[in-house]
């Protein structure tokens, strides 16, 4: 049995706390807002984020970070990527040397172009930062539906240790050395999912969605390869796996936000309607900047940025994608 603190009471942090508790671990769930911790302690449910899911009494819920970071074996960072630097800075003085931190947030910081793990490493240099990612909606994990993810760490032994902690009969975990590829897949797929949702909102069909998914993963892999990630990572759980579920699922807030924009909502109206953090909106500008920095052609990413930040009509964005110059899918040159 391990002592595990999950930092963040959003849907994903709560779902992972329940999973780890059911695996027999001693779990503490921390909220950055003491009033929310008090409310969850009283009701044991978050009807807004995970309706109908009861947090087991064995999970200790606290709003005190000193208590949460009192010698845990591992710490899970589950705050949204947009808040990760502030949270990391706040918690850094309490994190011991060599502490294993598992990041489960997905995103790239706009002003630094850093993936989330790099943000945590910069603010908490004494920690051993790892990442868990893959096609894993909290709504399904919290209900015990079969799910598969991937974990990456600096050392193989650490990845295998985390694999053993998270693995269960309904939650299968693979390991990989490619932390950068795992993080890029998790961040970029949210932007592509906005495009897929927009196509749904416009009333387009499965052909359109299949095109966005396959051409989207091509964009993600091109950028990843230029940045030093492994191409095969994008054919795995944190790449195409996460992209498929985020583009297709009714649980996907990125897909839903895109759907609403396809229906005529503005970006802000769509975010207000979703009522939860839409990570793709925060990662879109960073994805565009990375494409420009590494000179990688990413037309879907570019059109999503125009849709979000230049008020380009969704139908015009799709038309411009369809009317691009003729291309090879695979090079004819050996």
Briefly describe each language-model feature range.
Residues 83, 94, 119-127, 146-232:
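Internal alpha-helical scaffold of NAD(P)-dependent oxidoreductase catalytic cores
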Residues 1-53, 60-63:
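NAD(P)+-binding Rossmann beta1-loop-alpha1 motif at the extreme N-terminus of oxidoreductases
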Residues 70-71, 188, 240:
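Alpha-helix C-terminal capping/helix-to-coil transition sites in glycosyltransferase folds
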Residues 196-197, 225-235, 243-334:
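NAD(P)-dependent Rossmann-like dehydrogenase/reductase catalytic/cofactor-binding core
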Residues 55, 61-70, 74-144, 162:
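Rossmann-like NAD(P)(H) cofactor-binding subdomain of soluble oxidoreductases
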Residues 9, 13, 33, 84, ...:
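Generic structural signal for well-ordered, non-membrane alpha-helical segments
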């Amino acid at each position: 049995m391990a002592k595990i603190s999950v930092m963040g009471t959003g849907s994903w942090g709560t779902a992972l706390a329940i999973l780890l508790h059911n695996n027999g671990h001693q779990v503490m769930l921390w909220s950055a807002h003491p009033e929310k911790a008090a409310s969850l302690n009283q009701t044991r449910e978050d009807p807004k984020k995970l309706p109908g899911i009861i947090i087991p009494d064995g999970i200790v819920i606290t709003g005190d970070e000193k208590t949460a970071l009192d010698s845990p074996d591992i710490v899970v960072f589950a705050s949204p990527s947009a808040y990760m630097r502030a949270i990391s800075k706040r918690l850094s003085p309490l994190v011991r040397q060599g502490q294993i931190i598992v990041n489960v947030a997905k995103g790239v910081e706009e002003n630094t172009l850093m993936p989330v793990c790099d943000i945590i490493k910069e603010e908490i240099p004494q920690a051993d930062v790892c990442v868990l990612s893959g096609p894993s909606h909290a709504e399904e994990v919290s209900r015990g539906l079969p799910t598969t993810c991937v974990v990456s760490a600096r050392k193989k032994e650490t990845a295998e240790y985390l694999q053993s902690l998270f693995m269960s009969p309904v939650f299968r975990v693979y390991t990989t050395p490619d932390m950068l590829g795992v993080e890029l897949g998790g961040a970029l797929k949210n932007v592509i999912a906005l495009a897929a949702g927009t196509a749904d909102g416009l009333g387009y069909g499965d052909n359109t969605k299949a095109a966005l998914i396959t051409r989207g993963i091509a964009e993600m892999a091109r950028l990843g390869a230029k940045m030093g990630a492994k191409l095969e990572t994008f054919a795995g759980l944190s790449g195409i796996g996460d992209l498929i579920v985020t583009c297709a699922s009714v649980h996907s807030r990125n897909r839903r936000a895109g759907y609403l924009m396809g229906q005529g909502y503005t970006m802000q109206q769509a975010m207000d309607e979703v009522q939860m953090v839409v990570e793709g909106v925060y990662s879109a500008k960073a994805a565009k900047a990375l494409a420009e920095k590494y000179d990688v052609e990413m037309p879907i990413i570019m059109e999503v940025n125009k849709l979000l930040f230049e008020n380009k009509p969704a139908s015009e964005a799709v038309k411009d994608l369809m009317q691009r110059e003729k291309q090879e899918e695979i090079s004819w040159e050996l």
